[in-house]
Amino acid sequence: MPTINQLVRKGREDKVVKSKSPALQKGYNSFKKSQTNQSSPQKRGVCTRVGTMTPKKPNSALRKYARVRLTNGIEVTAYIGGIGHNLQEHSVVLVRGGRVKDLPGVRYHIVRGALDTAGVNNRKQGRSKYGTKRPKPGQAAAKK
C-alpha cells in the first residue's frame, strides 16, 4: 500500500490494454499519406489471396481464408465463414474483428452479404450472421 506522499510523487499508472484487432484501430489519411488513430468497427479491403488452411491439433478441416489489403494499407488474414463462397483475388470485402481459435494468425472475419461477398445459400437459421435474405413464405413449403 503506497503512502499519500508516494502517490503524489508518482501517481497511479493506467493499465495498457492491447487490442485484439489492431488493424481496425488505424485509419489512413490519403492527402497526407499517413496513418491516423481513427479506429472503426469494420474496414473495407481487397482480397490479395484466397485459399484454405488446416486448423490446429485436435481439429481437422480445410478452413477458408482470404488475405486482405485494407484501406489503411495493412494486410490481414481473414476467415470466410459459412458453407461455400464466391470470393477470388481482387474481390472487395468488408472485414470485422473476431479471431478463429483454431487458426493461428487469423484475427478477422469477412462479413457475408456485404460488398462483393455473397450470403450463404439455403440458410434458414442464424441468417443474419451469414448475410442470407429471409425466404419467401411460399418458397419454404414448396422445397419440402
Curated annotation (Swiss-Prot):
Task: Please give the Gene3D superfamilies that the UniProt record associates with this protein.
Answer: Nucleic acid-binding proteins
Biased composition range(s): Basic residues: 124-144
Judging by the UniProt lineage, the source's domain of life is Bacteria
Q: Which GO terms describe its molecular function?
A: rRNA binding; structural constituent of ribosome; tRNA binding
- GO cellular component annotations of the record: small ribosomal subunit
Compositionally biased spans, kind Polar residues: 27-42
Q: Where is this region: Disordered?
A: 1-55, 119-144
Annotated keywords? Methylation, Ribonucleoprotein, Ribosomal protein, RNA-binding, rRNA-binding, tRNA-binding
Q: What GO terms describe the biological role, i.e. biological process, of this protein? A: translation
Please give the residue positions where the record annotates the modification 3-methylthioaspartic acid.
Answer: D102
Q: Where is the chain membrane-spanning?
A: none
NCBIfam families in UniProt:
rpsL_bact
What does the subunit comment say? Part of the 30S ribosomal subunit. Contacts proteins S8 and S17. May interact with IF1 in the 30S initiation complex.
Q: What does this protein do?
A: With S4 and S5 plays an important role in translational accuracy. Interacts with and stabilizes bases of the 16S rRNA that are involved in tRNA selection in the A site and with the mRNA backbone. Located at the interface of the 30S and 50S subunits, it traverses the body of the 30S subunit contacting proteins on the other side and probably holding the rRNA structure together. The combined cluster of proteins S8, S12 and S17 appears to hold together the shoulder and platform of the 30S subunit.
Membership in a protein family: Belongs to the universal ribosomal protein uS12 family.
Q: What is this protein called?
A: Small ribosomal subunit protein uS12
Q: Which organism is it from?
A: Brevibacillus brevis (strain 47 / JCM 6285 / NBRC 100599)
Lineage of producing organism: Bacteria, Bacillati, Bacillota, Bacilli, Bacillales
